[in-house]
């Protein structure tokens, strides 16, 4: 269990560093991947129709 925890920590650290400087550009691919793996209705780009703007969810669909 300790080995797995260390590996996950080492993987999370570089990803977190890449997401911070990338900002929104790094978040778009995450929404694409989440849409493919999820059965929820998601937009590729948020239409800003919700109170959670930028959440990726589209209230109209």
From Swiss-Prot:
Q: Which residues form the propeptide?
A: 1-34
InterPro entries assigned: Hepcidin (IPR010500)
MF GO annotations: hormone activity
| Disulfide linkage | 43-59, 46-49, 47-55, 50-58
Keyword list (alphabetical) reads: Antibiotic, Antimicrobial, Cleavage on pair of basic residues, Disulfide bond, Hormone, Secreted
The answer to whether keyword Disulfide bond applies is yes
The UniProt entry's GO biological process terms, in alphabetical order, are: defense response to bacterium; intracellular iron ion homeostasis; negative regulation of cell population proliferation
GO CC annotations, alphabetized: extracellular region
Q: Which domain of life is it from?
A: Eukaryota
Segments crossing the lipid bilayer: none
Q: Where in the cell is it found?
A: Secreted
- Region labeled Disordered — which residues? 1-24
Indicate yes or no for the key word Nucleotide-binding. Answer: no
Please state the protein's primary subcellular location. secreted
Q: Which family does it belong to?
A: Belongs to the hepcidin family.
Function (record text): Seems to act as a signaling molecule involved in the maintenance of iron homeostasis. Seems to be required in conjunction with HFE to regulate both intestinal iron absorption and iron storage in macrophages. May also have antimicrobial activity.
Q: What is this protein called?
A: Hepcidin
Annotated source species = Oncorhynchus mykiss (Rainbow trout)
Q: Lineage from the top down?
A: Eukaryota, Metazoa, Chordata, Craniata, Vertebrata
The gene is hamp
């Amino acid at each position: 269990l300790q080995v797995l925890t260390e590996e996950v920590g080492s993987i999370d650290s570089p990803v977190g560093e890449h997401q911070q400087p990338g900002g929104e550009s790094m978040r778009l691919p995450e929404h694409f991947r989440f849409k493919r793996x999820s059965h929820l209705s998601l937009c590729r780009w948020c239409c800003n129709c919700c109170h959670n703007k930028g959440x990726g969810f589209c209230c109209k669909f």
